Amino acid sequence: MPSGSTGCCPSGWSDFLLQVAPEKTRLLRFSRFHPSRKRRFAFLGFEFFWLKDRQGIARVKRRTAPKKLQAACRRLKEWIRDHRHLPGREFLRGLNQRLRGHYQYFGVRGNSRALHRFFDWAKACVFKWRNRRGGKRRSFTWAEFTQALKQVAIARPGITEVARRRVFA
């Protein structure tokens, strides 16, 4: 084995000057014949796991990794808190940019629950922080807020992944 190899990755990686951090690397049995809660792993912000689809066929599913969802919520909360003083259109433009970016990266098939959770959390956070813009009186009630959201174009969650088309020749 070449030097720097951990024994868990192909030895050909050294040909490309790639190194693997042994403390971050592990071998995992990831098979549809051995599904369990322990057989999940996170990679590039997604959690990969096996689940049976409607036809009963085991498929690899992806969802937003819980740590990444928490981090995204934390970043969005800080942005909302720091920019709550902006005029409505400017605030919505910045909020929509952040929401769309999240949807475009994490908008894969099977992940709509996490997208909607992020959207609902963002709405609640906007309501909380836009109501704290000075003065003792609240800016608006929840009913007024939801009515206003229907009138403005706030980015809604959606699946952005394009399904692969099977072409038979």
Annotated model-derived regions:
Residues 1-169:
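Non-catalytic terminal/accessory segments
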